[in-house]
Amino acid sequence: MELAKSFDPKEIETRWYSTWETAGYFSPTDHKGADPYCIMLPPPNVTGTLHMGHAFQHTLMDALIRYHRMLGDNTLWQPGTDHAGIATQIVVERQLDQEGKDRRQMGREAFLERVWQWKEESGSTITRQMRRMGASCDWSRERFTMDETLSRAVTEVFVRLYREGLIYRGKRLVNWDPVLQTAVSDLEVVSVEEQGSLWHILYPFEQLEGGSEHQGLVVATTRPETMLGDMAVAVHPEDERYRHLIGRHLRLPLSERTIPIIADSYVDPAFGTGCVKITPAHDFNDYQVGLRHKLIPLNVFTLDGKINDNAPAEFQGLDRFDARKKVIADLQAQGLLVETRPHKLMVPRGDRTNTVIEPMLTDQWYLAMEGLAKQGLAVVASGKVRFVPENWTHVYNQWLENIQDWCISRQLWWGHRIPAWYDEDGNVTVAHDLEEARKLSGKEILRQDDDVLDTWFSSALWPFSTLGWPEQTPELKTFLPGSVLVTGFDIIFFWVARMVMMSLHFTGEVPFREVYITGLIRDAEGQKMSKSKGNVLDPLDLIDGVSLTELIRKRTTGLMNPKQAESIEKTTRKQFPQGIPAFGTDALRFTFASLASHGRDIKFDLQRCEGYRNFCNKLWNATRFVLMNCEGKDTGLDETLPLNFSQADKWIVGRLQQAEQGVVQAFDEYRFDLAAREMYEFVWDEYCDWYVELAKVQLSSADEAHQRATRRTLVRVLEAALRLAHPIIPFITEELWQAVAPLAGKTGTSIMHQPYPQADPARMDEHAAANVQLLKEIVNACRTLRGEMKLSPAERVPLLIEGDPSRLADFSPYLLALAKLSEVTILPDRLPDTDAPVAITGEFRLMLKIEVDVAAERERLNKEMQRLTLEIGKARTKLDNPDFLQRAPEKVVLQEKERLATFSATLEKLDQQLHKLG
């Protein structure tokens, strides 16, 4: 097979992905006795597009799946998408808004038809992009959270939980988005630091003392409009300033009500005046205070953020922020506004609408969590579920130990409608469908609850609903528990913990045995990637390349604040003056893997992409060299013919075993960064830079058995290296493997189903490794001497070596080629006493036979002696440190002592050379 002269990623990627998917290579193998290995894809939003976080995590999941597939496991990577209630409804509502339509005018049924239409039109975008990333999911099993089977599972879970007494309806405070007019989860609320004000307001006593008209308590607040719903003023029970006032009453300014002064340890005496207004209906902390003191909450907001009829008439109907202005003005007019101070505060805003989120007292459906949480904590404590890195266990435990009941209802139309029906008297019946509800209630006329379930509710069932639950399917039996969940730390509570609890409750099994928590992809400066910052990168732009014009257009379109466009364009022009070149999928995947350490934040650096694209080119060119020198020739397939393996052959085979050992260990420990580094160093530094060059010398040998062994080693080590790297760079390895495999005696239709390389320690030859290491050091020393003497690459010069001839006997042909020498002379005695520079490598002294610039040589020796003096100082510092001597392994201490001895001996020899120069 003839390879193209240069690597063209796009052509190869398109061809091979189509081949794999058509052939059904992504499906479970179901081989008898194969261990199941299952990863559930965290379902992305159905109408979303692939972002860097997706691409990063999908690369890691795919690497694991491909690795375990090659280990012979029965692998399933279960794909699917999430209906993403709020996100999808907003997109469609914006489309309608542009058409001058309103969903409420359309009606629920017509609106949902429109959403389904949008889902069909754009729902395949993200899965198409996943394919471009090389994701080897079993697409034949793709699921959607609102599929008929998954919806049936959602209904079954709701009904069972309700009948078990765990789901109930109650009036509580929730995060309320007045624009969307729905409850939202904490994850959909973004706290933003903003400049506001702290208003000090006088609350007069109900009964005045001492004739002072405004005698009372001064209360500090950042939200004066909510005072219309105040039910008390709280002070700290130990605050000497106010202890004598506890139990008295105050007149609520601007209202005809009186409210009590209460004592509660929630109050911070040092904040503001030490007096806090308590508004149970509009603040989460105040709500808890209200429960402790039996205060009745008074809601003064409508669902769209206006003042309702519970407030004084002059405020009714005003928008909440207009009401704030009027409250301030009226307080000022009445002389009750004592002071206004600038104050920075954290403002909760909706991540979709950017509106200020209101704590709102509403009727919602809740799931009681205490009992479920105990189960969730127990399986992590027992090790049935393990977090990697382990420190995330603490975060998981902390959330579950402080869990609140879960508000599972949302005031949306798109989603799983709550299976609850009401009769004309408001009595509720929970059932699987209307027919069952009629039977249970004995009523014919029933109205279904308008609310839908929180998107996270159906997501919590994902590990078992996608496998066919509540039916007891073979897939459920085989692939639950799953092997590992790969996800981000931001949804440990919202998704990970809930999957654990739901899976345990309904199947008795944990959903997965391990949870690998990835870091967050940030830009090169460590900033979070966001549209508003203008630092977002599209993974497909890195794969295919993008012009500067198109990149600017993408970054400046659809900004919440259009004024940012100018600065974003300026930054983009500075960062990417030529746009972004095409790196190809493999280079991007290699970059992601190399960044996947166990840290919390990951800085994405475009230069790494360039480096790994160069790696792909290097691998391609090395394979072309191997094919040109091995195709049509004897590569040692006939085991009866003699093979004469060199020290170099044995060394590279041994080094391959070490690489295989390192990569397998790295995969098993989720250290993708170490796996990537091991692959890179072996292929680039050892195989391409050294072994291929040594093999060129061997291929010119007159010994046929030597040539045969060289070709055999070239193709077999390369073939194994391609299998080793396949999980991370699947496309290029498949293309190259197809060409190399026959020469290595391998058969099969795809590298995907080849066995993953396993190290054989018996093939590690320490003697060969030591010899090649010495050869490399001598070659490098010669190259250094050539550089310092400013010899042109074409100029061949003689080399004199002082040392044991028996150790250097086989080196001459390699040295002549790799160090560009005209001849090599090995002297058992001392080198000639000349001014020529001498390099020292272990027990050997090297000299290029050439006239010397004495001044330059003196400078070189001084520099090298300075370096050695520095290294000696570092080694001595370590060895003088009692902690190092006590804690470091004995082998490490011994290595450090050997380093010190070697450096000291070399320094002494260089000093002698320096004196010889005069």
Swiss-Prot record:
Catalytic activity, reaction form: tRNA(Val) + L-valine + ATP = L-valyl-tRNA(Val) + AMP + diphosphate
User: Which intervals of this chain are the motif 'HIGH' region?
Assistant: 44-54
Protein EC: 6.1.1.9
Residues that coordinate or bind ATP: K531
Q: Coiled-coil ranges per the record?
A: 851-918
- Motif ('KMSKS' region) positions are 528-532
Cellular compartments per GO CC = cytosol
- A biological-process GO annotation: valyl-tRNA aminoacylation
Q: Name one GO molecular function term.
A: ATP binding
UniProt keywords (A-Z) are: Aminoacyl-tRNA synthetase, ATP-binding, Coiled coil, Cytoplasm, Ligase, Nucleotide-binding, Protein biosynthesis
Q: Which InterPro entries match?
A: aa-tRNA-synth_I_CS, aa-tRNA-synth_Ia, Anticodon_Ia_Val, M/V/L/I-tRNA-synth_anticd-bd, Rossmann-like_a/b/a_fold, tRNA-bd_arm, tRNAsynth_Ia_anticodon-bd, Val-tRNA_synth_C_sf
Main location class: cytoplasm
- According to its UniProt record, where is this protein located? Cytoplasm
Name the PROSITE patterns for this protein: AA_TRNA_LIGASE_I (PS00178)
- Domains as described in the record: ValRS has two distinct active sites: one for aminoacylation and one for editing. The misactivated threonine is translocated from the active site to the editing site. The C-terminal coiled-coil domain is crucial for aminoacylation activity.
The UniProt family comment states: Belongs to the class-I aminoacyl-tRNA synthetase family. ValS type 1 subfamily.
Q: What is the protein's known function?
A: Catalyzes the attachment of valine to tRNA(Val). As ValRS can inadvertently accommodate and process structurally similar amino acids such as threonine, to avoid such errors, it has a 'posttransfer' editing activity that hydrolyzes mischarged Thr-tRNA(Val) in a tRNA-dependent manner.
- Subunit note: Monomer.
Q: Which NCBIfam families match?
A: PRK05729.1, valS
Q: Kindly provide the name given to this protein in its UniProt entry.
A: Valine--tRNA ligase
Q: Which organism is it from?
A: Nitrosomonas europaea (strain ATCC 19718 / CIP 103999 / KCTC 2705 / NBRC 14298)
Native organism taxonomy: Bacteria, Pseudomonadati, Pseudomonadota, Betaproteobacteria, Nitrosomonadales
The gene that this protein is the product of is: valS
